[in-house]
Amino acid sequence: MIEIQQIIENAWDNRALLKDKKTTTAIREVINLLDIGKLRVAEPTSNGWQVNEWVKKAVVLYFPIQTMETIEVGPFEFHDKIPLKTGYKEKGIRVVPHAVARHGAYISKGTILMPSYVNIGAYVDEGTMVDTWATVGSCAQIGKGVHLSGGVGIGGVLEPLQAAPVIIEDNVFIGSRCIAVEGVRVETEAVLGANVVLTMSTKIIDVTGDEPIEMKGRVPARSVVIPGSYTKKFAAGEYQVPCALIIGKRKESTDKKTSLNNALRENDVAV
């Protein structure tokens, strides 16, 4: 793997090497390893999440070495550089028409894809539901048992290389039409109510205590979150700016499904 990594690094610094067969073979090998889950753009470590920049470089370099091709699926036709993912039956994945995933995205067994889209470099772990019109962007990392509700947008990131992708950890519930972009991390078992929008600059305010606690870029584990707003002064006057409010917690002690249902009911959260 070290040899492949060095080939990728050399090609990144010298694009003329993209004409060499050794380079193109190495790039395609990385994409194949991403496709089967043997490599990841980002992975959990004992010190938090680690971004593998060289893998992201391989994904970026994959585009210029590919040629446009017509892809025919029954009466439907596509024209693109990246092939579609295949072999769902053998992988134990349920795919409802017209869900689409690109080659180079890993999707684990027991996952359900309703009509949705999963981009190259993404990692979708076991037992996750990607609901209708949800999108999983390039290199996004989705954990086990996650529910991405209808119309959810999980942003992708290829560049800048050092930027972390959006990370949705295990057993998270993301409500309808939520958006998470710019490397936001939603930690284990958190619940996002419908229409929550999270960017790296979005204020996430914990209002469960006597005083508000502000944070950005991270939703703590088991938090129950709804959309909110705060007042900000501008030259033209005071206006409301969107934020996210932490209004409660899922209980650790109960069954995951039970704790989810209780959290939604107790906090009156729409999903």
Language model: regions and residue ranges:
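Terminal amphipathic alpha-helical/low-complexity segments used for targeting or macromolecular assembly
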Residues: M1-I93, R222, P227-V271
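Structural signal for interior beta-strand "rungs" in well-ordered beta-sheet cores
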Residues: I93-K233
